[in-house]
Amino acid sequence: MRSAQVYRWQIPMDAGVVLRDRRLKTRDGLYVCLREGECEGWGEISPLPGFSQETWEEAQCVLLAWVNNWLAGDCELPQMPSVAFGVSCALAELADTLPQAANFRAAPLCNGDPDDLILKLADMPGEKVAKVKVGLYEAVRDGMVVNLLLEAIPDLHLRLDANRAWTPLKGQQFAKYVNPDYRGRIAFLEEPCKTREDSRAFARETGIAIAWDESLREPDFAFVAEEGVRAVVIKPTLTGSLEKVHEQVQAAHALGLTAVISSSIESSLGLTQLARIAAWLTPDTIPGLDTLDLMQAQQVRRWPGSTLPFVDVDALERLL
């Protein structure tokens, strides 16, 4: 016998979270819980404003329609990426095919003061990997901050993310302030320039390796080995089903590229599932999941070590 519940939720964000020039005051999304016999599975559907093609209202309509079809015996996955991902996670939990082992080691995210990151990294065991958003301020300032961090922590490797913010000139201004001796410790810089061609040129001219992120979701993207391209950053909420995520990881690994499972600012429930996906598909790579502290609460499932207030499922708005 099948049954299902759908919940709507909204979590207040910390002040200062800006996505594509718009302030994100709340994170809005949905959970689906599927039950069959004694088994149950959960999934999160939370389109990311400014990045997802769909709104959460559109996702809600597609999810509710899919759940009704599933209750009637239909199992075909929806096409909408955020819904496909959440539903496929719920089905995988239901079938016990999503491994429980999780990689909760997150590359800490530097959102402001580099001194805060230096302190955080001092206590980090093992490989020191951190992520810095660039492109929000002047490129020269970004270059100086990155150089400072690499100089202060000799065993640090940085992942940088520009979200296509730079023109070729700004990219050159950034690189000018990063000591060439340190550039090898930039693990990769995600999508530095507005076009792929300019990003490739940036990698050739600076010796700084790049990674594809937004490009993976463009219709003309193909997985090929390219000079200067070291990694792909896979955001499952923006990608689609677990099967599609798995295919992208396999395609990257076949070319010798690093595949990084990364957050789209999911709630703690979604983040714990991403940690499990990372341990399963990319066991040797630290995932990019250090986004929970951008929120003011965790929900339904706790993130290990988080001191954020916890909201149980009973406090959520039930739609079905």
Curated annotation (Swiss-Prot):
One GO BP annotation of this record: menaquinone biosynthetic process
KW Lipoprotein (keyword) present: no
Cysteine pairs bridged by disulfides in the record: none
Annotated pathway: Quinol/quinone metabolism; 1,4-dihydroxy-2-naphthoate biosynthesis; 1,4-dihydroxy-2-naphthoate from chorismate: step 4/7; Quinol/quinone metabolism; menaquinone biosynthesis
Active-site residues, as the UniProt record annotates them: 133, 235
GO molecular function: magnesium ion binding; O-succinylbenzoate synthase activity
InterPro entries noted in UniProt: Enolase-like_C_sf, Enolase-like_N, Enolase_C-like, Mandelate_racemase_C, OSB_synthase_MenC1, OSBS_N
Keyword set, alphabetical order: Lyase, Magnesium, Menaquinone biosynthesis, Metal-binding
EC number(s) per entry: 4.2.1.113
Binding site for Mg(2+): 161, 190, 213
Top-level taxonomic group: Bacteria
Catalytic activity of the protein: (1R,6R)-6-hydroxy-2-succinyl-cyclohexa-2,4-diene-1-carboxylate = 2-succinylbenzoate + H2O
HAMAP family, per the entry: MenC_1
Family in the record: Belongs to the mandelate racemase/muconate lactonizing enzyme family. MenC type 1 subfamily.
Classification via PANTHER family: O-SUCCINYLBENZOATE SYNTHASE, O-SUCCINYLBENZOATE SYNTHASE-RELATED
Name of protein: o-succinylbenzoate synthase
Native source organism of the sequence: Escherichia fergusonii (strain ATCC 35469 / DSM 13698 / CCUG 18766 / IAM 14443 / JCM 21226 / LMG 7866 / NBRC 102419 / NCTC 12128 / CDC 0568-73)
